[in-house]
Amino acid sequence: NRKETGIWKFETTPRMSSYLLAFVAGDLQGVTATTKNGTLVGVYSTKAHPLSNLDFSLDIAVRSIEFYEDYYGVKYPIPQSLHIALPDFSAGAMENWGLVTYREVYLVVDENSTFASRQQVALVIAHELAHQWFGNLVTMKWWDDLWLNESFANMMEYVCVDAIEPSWNIFEDFQTSGVPAALKRDATDGVQSVHVEVSHPDEINTLFDGAIVYAKGSRLMHMLRRWLGDADFAKGLHAY
């Protein structure tokens, strides 16, 4: 029976793609921190979870942003980075600009969470934060080049987590986990290439082939990174 009403006013966004706009409303709780360059980072969930279950993800998010800023040589583009665990969410996570949404399993970490699940949470957060530059700050003219967004992000999630948690040796997983599926899928007659022409919006959802756009595309990017060397590759990304 609440009768309060109000008008919410938001700051004007930078120029952005409409598919990256999100709103979240609910009875939420959260933890916050600030990066060394002053970006406000927050992780939120419903009150069904202890507040301490958000600490791991907050730490990963802060350090991931700081890593990407150093690696790309480009500051995080907007004032805040909020991460929300949703009780019911069809996607794994979505890189809405400044308001990333997740399934709870990819953001909430409790004392019984396995090491593997913690690694997965870190990779998903790093993936969505990579998109804040690849896909959000720099967006393709059309969906034909979706693979660039997802391939970069899929590779960079491993580069990032390997840098902030070197003892995990996470890049060993990158070099093996997605390769068999990508090779098998790529050998199928009529399989799509990483770059697919899109003539109608109804075709967009067909592009999200995990074995091709994510696994194969990210390995192609890694081949380029190894061929150029990490320093020159990073310089190229800065120009990009």
Where are the language model's segments positioned?
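Hydrophobic alpha-helical and helix-loop surface patches within well-folded domains
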Residues: 10, 42-240
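Non-catalytic architectural context of zinc metalloproteases
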Residues: 1-59, 79
